[in-house]
Amino acid sequence: MDLDPEMTRLFSQNPRLRQLNQDAFHSPKVRVVNADAFVWLEQNAEFFDFAVVDFPDPTNHSLGKLYTSAFYRLLDKRLSANGLAVIQSTSPMFARQSYWCIVKTVQSVGLCATPYHVYVPSFGEWGFVLASKQPFIQPVQYPQGLRFLSADTAPNLFQFPKDMQPVDAEVNRLNNQALVHYYEAEWQKVTP
């Protein structure tokens, strides 16, 4: 799902980008939807076993609404009983209060929120939230052939050093947009 049809067209038609994404847009498992994710979830009755929520960072109120309790409530309604959603949640190192605001907001709608982080070469230390209806239990074994993830490395994803530990934050709601304010203040310190 992407709001901009030109983005999905570009990545589904440009030969270099098709090669880079291994022709993912042409897989029979993929259905491209160009719509506002918030509105689409409100109007859609499908259930999902897995959702990747990879929105741009909450730099303004239009994007901030996609990180609100209202949005996560819609997501909760669309997840199957054993469904999982992974949510891009900014950097717990550079935007610590923003990150924990997202975790708290996911929890506020009754979803289990499992915070984790990983080093992403193009972004640095980056945070995610695994949202589910049941508490997440880490697998004991992982599929063969994975390049980076294993039973030995996975536990480190869920360990937060002292400078990324939880901090107090408000639930992000449509009527307060707390996350947008946290995000703006924190990233201004990093990129003046």
Describe each region flagged by the PLM.
Residues M1-V86, M93-I102, Q107-V109, S122:
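The AdoMet/dcAdoMet-binding core of the Class I SAM-like
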Residues Q43, C112-P192:
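Soluble small-group transferase modules, centered on the S-adenosyl donor enzyme superfamily
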Residues V86-Q88, T114-P115:
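Short catalytic-loop micro-motif centered on adjacent basic/acidic residues
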